[in-house]
């Protein structure tokens, strides 16, 4: 099956800095593809090159099996991290203005309903909240009925309720068969929304797969957590890594059943036990490090 979008040997250099270092990947129709990485990893440059905002140094970009054409910008939707809009226009007037720029467009009333804009559609652009603005920018990205949608950190700065609401909208868009490229610093968001993920660092793709595949390969261990007062064993009696964290004991294991059987056989009280499963954030930190980057 021909991918909707295919990137081959993409390179972008700025003088002596290689921002994107010979990366390749393909995205199939109807998937949500997450491009993740720490600050400076090259993901924003990659997205900007694919969007045709920045010219690549070398490499090829194919859309529907053909080299990307000038019409590409008319066929995709982009929600940037931030967009400057005219403050003298209302939300609905702005939607109408953007609609006039395209031949193929969605009905404004449909977008207003889907993105829950009705309550503030007659307010000025600079008079709406952060959560309302993100839903509004999503509606603008959908105005030309794109098959491919770029969402660049769409939930940054949103409170948990507004973020979950945005996730629901993205899920609705996926159900319509649209293809999404998502960048985000929220690993929970990527794990919840993405079918496939590429993790970038220093301009290269260092891991690629579904969230479950990445967790299984790069962070398979689970953590069994017990109150320290209930752990009456010498850690040397166990053949598993054990560490003390504040007033708890953490046991790392690839086989939870075997771990629990071992603890019970040594008379450990499991009544206040908790089990922490690995997640995408664990994978991300294991691969890219825990040191803060500017």
Tell what function each PLM region has.
Residues 51:
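Helix-to-loop junction immediately C-terminal to a conserved catalytic motif
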Residues 149-153:
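Catalytic Walker B motif of ABC-type/P-loop ATPase nucleotide-binding domains
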Residues 221-294:
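Short, charged/small-residue-rich alpha-helical element at the C-terminal edge
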Residues 124-128:
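Conserved ABC ATPase signature
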Residues 168-252:
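ABC transporter nucleotide-binding domain
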Residues 96, 100, 105-120:
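Conserved ABC ATPase "signature" region
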Residues 59-72:
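Conserved ABC transporter NBD signature motif
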């Amino acid at each position: 099956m021909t991918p909707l979008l295919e990137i081959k040997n993409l390179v972008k250099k700025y003088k002596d800095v290689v921002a994107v270092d010979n990366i390749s990947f393909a995205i199939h129709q109807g998937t949500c593809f997450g491009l993740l990485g720490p600050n400076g990893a090259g993901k924003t440059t990659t997205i900007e090159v694919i969007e045709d905002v920045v010219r690549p140094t070398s490499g090829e970009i194919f859309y529907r099996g053909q080299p990307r054409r000038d019409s590409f910008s008319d066929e995709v939707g982009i929600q940037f991290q931030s967009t400057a809009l005219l403050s003298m226009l209302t939300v609905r007037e702005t939607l109408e203005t953007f609609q006039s720029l395209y031949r193929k467009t969605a009905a404004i009333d449909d977008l207003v309903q889907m993105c829950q804009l009705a309550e503030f559609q007659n307010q000025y652009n600079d008079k709406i909240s952060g959560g309302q603005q993100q839903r509004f920018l999503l509606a603008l990205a959908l105005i030309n009925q794109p098959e491919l949608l770029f969402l660049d950190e769409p939930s940054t700065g949103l409170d948990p309720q507004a973020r979950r609401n945005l996730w629901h909208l993205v899920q609705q868009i996926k159900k319509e068969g649209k293809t999404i490229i998502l960048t985000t610093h929220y690993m929970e968001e990527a794990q919840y929304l993405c079918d496939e993920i590429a993790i970038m660092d220093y301009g290269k793709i260092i891991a690629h797969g579904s969230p479950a595949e990445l967790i299984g390969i790069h962070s398979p261990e689970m953590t069994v957590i017990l109150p320290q007062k209930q752990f009456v064993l010498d850690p040397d009696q166990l053949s598993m890594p054990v560490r003390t964290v504040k007033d708890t004991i953490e046991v790392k294991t690839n086989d939870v059943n075997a771990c629990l059987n071992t603890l019970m056989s040594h008379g450990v009280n499991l009544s206040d036990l908790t089990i922490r499963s690995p997640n995408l954030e664990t994978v991300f930190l294991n691969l890219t490090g825990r040191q803060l980057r500017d």
